[in-house]
Design a protein with these regions (language model features):
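Charged catalytic and DNA/RNA-contacting regions of genome-maintenance
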Residues: 1-331, 344-360, 364-451
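Conserved interaction-surface patches within small, structured recognition/assembly domains
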Residues: 334-338
């Protein structure tokens, strides 16, 4: 058999590491797919299947999508349950000696997708990790778009099914015992559109799990996190973090706090009751309109909409917490003027949770920074209004709300009010912010004068 061309050999070597993914292989201004990936992707994406010389007698099946419009195609693959590995050129072609080096920089899966084009801003995109043992299961969930990260232990299969229904994750990873459990996996995949996959056994090695948790959360032991008596949660949390590191190729600094909760703190609602009550979607067509959430949702921000949805999906049962929430509601109802003022200030606030994530991951564009700055500007006014309410929740809110004045002042002094979307277009920083930048800008515009 004839040998593959050097480029095709490189493709095969990369693909070998990501057998469960569609490989987007960067060539110039396109992401190209070959062999079985090309056949599959061309059908799903409804694009032309062609061929490419690969060094063998038969041409390799090939299809491709433009680099600048890849999100549209990538999202369609994700919506159809595929994982996509993004393989980029990792060296300057002008400096390359021979074939340009390429490597996978990120794997996009249903539970790790951060595309603004596909995600509902009012709904969390959860990735769930489950470690099931004989008597207990550990459940860990994360929304990498917001940094929300939590874990619990569950004592029965029925309660585990209820927890899955409560979060309705986009993706679940689990061990063999979970995948062999008496759960309705077909319903999860077909009706709930949950992608489910097996986690490699080495992900559940105790020392590896404890090490990755300690490094991610900045602690020396599990006791400091409250996990010393929760081995199942250590396994599910450690496996989840390993999966994120393997797919995102990033330190994920914004995932830095783990919330440990008990399912006994909330009302347990089985899947049938949850559907029949139409809490967040209607029974017939699965739309928000007509559900309890649709009736109650008068929120002004995407963050508030997600929080309200979570409140509805997991009702409180602790009397003190219920009364604290009711006291806050009563205070709002009794002071319509202040309530309406707060709503006016909330209305223009952008999705700060997801903006902070993009900034942390260095995927934000200059206009994201302006959106973040304009939201920060409103925090002192909201905090002043919150101080008017004398209830437990509002007092805690006042104490916890950091105005981040120093960050606002930094953005105000540095970024132009109407910057471009793309960093490479320039014109991001204000004149006078940094002398070195001013010198370079002057050299660009007044170069002839210099000469």
């Amino acid at each position: 058999m004839a040998a593959l061309t050097p480029m095709m050999q490189q493709y095969v070597e990369v693909k070998e590491k990501y057998k469960d993914c569609i490989l987007f292989y960067r060539i110039g201004d396109f992401y190209e797919m070959f062999f079985e990936d090309a056949i599959t992707a061309s059908k799903v994406l409804e694009i032309t299947l062609t061929g490419k010389d690969c060094g063998q007698e038969e041409r390799a099946p090939m299809c491709g999508v433009p680099y600048h419009a890849c999100d549209v195609y990538l999202n369609k693959l994700i919506e159809n349950g595929f994982k996509v590995a993004i393989c980029e050129q990792v060296e300057d072609p002008k400096l390359a000696k021979g074939l340009v080096k390429r490597d996978v920089i990120r794997v996009v899966t249903p539970g790790t997708n951060m595309s603004q084009a596909i995600l509902d801003e009012n709904t969390n995109n959860y990735l769930m990790s489950i470690y099931l043992s004989k008597d207990m299961s550990g459940v860990s969930v994360v929304d990498i778009t917001t940094g929300e990260f939590k874990t619990c232990r569950i004592s029965s299969i029925a309660k585990l099914a209820d927890e899955i229904n409560k979060y309705s994750p986009s993706e679940i990873i689990g061990n063999d015992d979970f995948l062999n459990a008496p759960l309705d996996f077909e319903y999860m995949k077909d009706r709930q559109k949950i992608a489910i996959s097996k986690t490699p056994e080495h992900y559940f090695n105790q020392s590896i799990c404890e090490d990755v948790i300690s490094r991610q959360l900045g602690t020396n032991n599990m006791a400091g996190l409250g996990l010393s008596d929760m081995p199942e949660s250590i396994y599910s949390t450690g496996a989840l973090l390993q999966y994120l590191h393997e797919t995102q190729k990033n330190s994920l600094e914004h995932i830095n706090k783990l919330e440990i909760y008990s399912i006994d703190d909330y009302m347990i609602i089985d899947s049938s009751t949850r559907r029949n009550l139409e809490l967040t979607e209607t029974l017939r067509d699965k739309n928000k309109k007509g559900s309890l959430l649709w009736v109650l949702d008068k929120t002004k921000t995407a963050m508030g909409a997600r929080l309200l949805k979570n409140y509805i999906e997991q009702p409180l049962i602790m009397e003190d917490e219920i009364n604290n929430r009711l006291d806050a509601i009563e205070a709002f109802n009794n002071d319509v003027i202040t309530r309406d003022e707060i709503r006016e200030y909330l209305n223009p606030i952008y999705d700060m949770e997801r903006l902070m994530t993009r900034i942390s991951l260095r995927t934000a564009n200059p206009r994201d920074l302006i959106a973040f700055k304009s939201s920060l500007k409103l925090l002192p006014f909201i905090k002043r209004l919150v101080a008017a309410f004398d209830t437990t929740l509002f007092k805690k809110m006042y104490e916890d709300l950091d105005e981040l004045t120093d960050l606002y002042e930094l953005l105000e002094s540095s970024i132009n009010e109407d910057p471009p979307i793309l960093i490479r277009e320039g014109g991001i920083f204000k004149d006078g912010y940094l002398n070195d930048i001013d010198v370079l800008k002057n050299a660009k515009t007044d170069g002839k004068t210099w000469l």
